[in-house]
């Protein structure tokens, strides 16, 4: 075989020309110890707090503690394959999630990865999960209503776009149900919804997803799920990830509603991570910055001014109390951060008053400015009547011989309590709510038996839609009771009342 020197030199030249000197420079560290979802890493001298680092196998970790000779890292995934001596690389990135309309209708985890089996998410934009809340000048005071579809909430403790309204109460008394109703009520509005499930059972999250799917609400909703079996670091970060998704809509002049279900479990997850990192514990063993943890999250809900597009992010955080103790550490913290609370009570729930909202303890500090005039006109009387009823009810339990005026107030109050009851997943539009409240506060129900009120209400909407459709149309358009609307509605209520009494005789 003849060796051609020219050919060989040509091949070598080609090889040299095509040689690409790829040197990958990365700052690395070594795992000193690992356990309980926390790794201690030696090295990584220039690493920054909240930076992502990469363990072997592509598992990410979040840098939380920067100490003299090591770094405390919360592992955001399965830690069983990570061992002492493993090499850890810096990524130079801060945790980000995909945002935009691509995430609507999807169930994702804290990192934004889909967990619903519907394929990858093709989002055109990602955002950091930790950003600074809008400043004072960037904001505008809350002035537009954000309807929950629940009469008790929209009349007594109204929520405005850009508000933070806490839902607080013991376990299993309908806190999530109130939040889901609020999502369903946004169906024909321009509000996008984010539901953050934090530390919940996977079956509960699947149930919520099924309910939203069934009612056609999933098309404008994203579910961010960090379930009970997920690492504590992911449960702690889930609300921030969901908030970034909601902020995309807020910053683009749109409106979003976010539900944190619930922040008690998020606080417990953060406590777990902090104690494992050996941070000094404070009251109830929570770390010293637990208040800041919640305040920096909830301050991101805001109504922006017109120059910034007038978008809004409304937050409904949920807190679970133990035996109604609202003076515990986390409940008092979140109550002080939010703009009001909806307090749910077990006694009311078991008495069949659902949603079990305690009207006396529930308050909305800024929602009044967002209430439409029509609702204000009926809710003012309603609040007064309810307060008098509660007072008289306690008094009436002792005395049987009551004068006619007191009897009348008790009768009216009992009917108003009945009106405020509402079946689950049946949110009402504003015009329907003000119609039934107008009927109640103006005495149209006083002569009806209590057990007939639910049937009366259901029939009333159908009656007005068929015979007096102009009433709903006018209320929707004018958002206030004019003399003309009042006259027409009073006439309709009189007509329907007579018709209804004949059917129940």
Curated annotation (Swiss-Prot):
The record marks 362 as: Required for activity. InterPro entries: ATP_synth_asu-like_sf, ATP_synth_asu_C, ATP_synth_asu_C_sf, ATP_synth_F1_a_nt-bd_dom, ATP_synth_F1_asu, ATPase_a/bsu_AS, ATPase_F1/V1/A1_a/bsu_N, ATPase_F1/V1/A1_a/bsu_N_sf. GO terms for cellular component: plasma membrane; proton-transporting ATP synthase complex. It is an enzyme of class 7 (translocase). Coiled coil: none annotated. It is a peripheral membrane protein. It holds the Pfam family ATP-synt_ab_N. It comes from the Bacteria. It is found in: Cell inner membrane. Disulfide bonds: none annotated. It catalyses: ATP + H2O + 4 H(+)(in) = ADP + phosphate + 5 H(+)(out). ATP binds at residues 169-176. CDD domains: ATP-synt_F1_alpha_C, ATP-synt_F1_alpha_N, F1-ATPase_alpha_CD. Keywords: ATP synthesis, ATP-binding, Cell inner membrane, Cell membrane, CF(1), Hydrogen ion transport, Ion transport, Membrane, Nucleotide-binding, Translocase, Transport. One of its GO terms (molecular function) is proton-transporting ATP synthase activity, rotational mechanism. SUPFAM superfamilies: C-terminal domain of alpha and beta subunits of F1 ATP synthase, N-terminal domain of alpha and beta subunits of F1 ATP synthase, P-loop containing nucleoside triphosphate hydrolases. Its EC number is 7.1.2.2. Belongs to the ATPase alpha/beta chains family. Produces ATP from ADP in the presence of a proton gradient across the membrane. The alpha chain is a regulatory subunit. F-type ATPases have 2 components, CF(1) - the catalytic core - and CF(0) - the membrane proton channel. CF(1) has five subunits: alpha(3), beta(3), gamma(1), delta(1), epsilon(1). CF(0) has three main subunits: a(1), b(2) and c(9-12). The alpha and beta chains form an alternating ring which encloses part of the gamma chain. CF(1) is attached to CF(0) by a central stalk formed by the gamma and epsilon chains, while a peripheral stalk is formed by the delta and b chains. This is ATP synthase subunit alpha. It comes from Desulfosudis oleivorans (strain DSM 6200 / JCM 39069 / Hxd3) (Desulfococcus oleovorans). The gene is atpA.
């Amino acid at each position: 075989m003849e060796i051609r020197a020219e050919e060989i030199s040509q091949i070598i030249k080609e090889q040299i020309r095509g040689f690409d000197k790829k040197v990958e420079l990365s700052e690395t560290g070594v795992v000193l110890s690992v356990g309980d979802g926390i790794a201690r890493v030696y090295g990584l001298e220039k690493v920054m707090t909240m930076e992502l680092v990469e363990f072997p196998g592509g598992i990410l970790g979040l840098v939380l503690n920067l100490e003299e000779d090591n770094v405390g890292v919360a592992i955001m995934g399965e830690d069983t394959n990570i061992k002492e001596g493993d090499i850890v690389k810096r990524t130079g990135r801060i945790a980000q999630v995909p945002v935009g309309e691509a995430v609507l209708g999807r169930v994702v985890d804290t990192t934004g990865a889909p967990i619903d089996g519907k394929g990858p998410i093709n989002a055109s934009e990602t955002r950091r999960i930790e950003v600074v809340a809008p400043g004072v000048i960037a904001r505008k005071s809350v002035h537009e209503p954000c309807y929950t579809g629940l009469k008790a909430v929209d009349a007594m403790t109204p929520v405005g776009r850009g508000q933070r309204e806490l839902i607080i109460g013991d376990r299993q008394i309908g806190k999530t149900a109130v939040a889901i109703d609020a999502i369903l009520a946004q169906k024909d509005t321009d509000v996008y919804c984010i539901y953050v499930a934090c530390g919940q059972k996977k079956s509960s999250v699947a149930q919520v997803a099924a309910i939203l799917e069934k009612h056609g609400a999933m098309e404008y909703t994203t579910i961010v799920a960090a379930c009970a079996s997920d690492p504590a670091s992911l449960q702690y970060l889930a609300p921030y990830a969901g908030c970034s998704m909601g902020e995309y809509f807020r910053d683009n002049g749109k409106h979003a509603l976010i539900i944190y279900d619930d922040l008690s479990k998020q606080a417990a997850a953060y406590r777990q991570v902090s104690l494992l990192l050996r941070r000094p514990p404070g009251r109830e063993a929570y770390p010293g910055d637990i208040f800041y943890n919640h305040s920096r999250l909830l301050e991101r809900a805001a109504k922006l001014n017109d120059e910034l597009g007038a978008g809004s992010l409304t937050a409904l955080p949920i807190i679970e109390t133990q035996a109604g103790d609202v003076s515990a550490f986390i409940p008092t913290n979140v109550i002080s951060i939010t703009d009001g609370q909806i307090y749910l009570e077990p006694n009311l729930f078991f008495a069949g008053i659902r949603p079990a909202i305690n009207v006396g303890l529930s308050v909305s500090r800024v929602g009044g400015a967002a209430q439409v005039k029509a609702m204000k006109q009926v809710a003012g009387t309603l609040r007064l009547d309810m307060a008098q009823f509660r007072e008289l009810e306690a008094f009436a339990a002792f005395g049987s011989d009551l004068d006619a005026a007191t009897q009348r107030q008790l009768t009216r109050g009992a009917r108003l309590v009945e009106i405020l009851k509402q079946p689950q997943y049946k949110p009402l539009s504003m015009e329907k709510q003000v119609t039934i409240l107008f009927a109640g506060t103006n005495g149209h129900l006083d002569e009806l038996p209590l057990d007939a009120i639910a049937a009366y209400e259901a029939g009333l909407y159908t009656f007005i839609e068929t015979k007096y459709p102009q009433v709903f149309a006018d209320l929707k358009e004018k958002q206030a009771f004019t003399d003309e609307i009042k006259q027409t509605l009073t006439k309709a209520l009189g007509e329907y009342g007579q018709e209804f009494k004949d059917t129940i005789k």
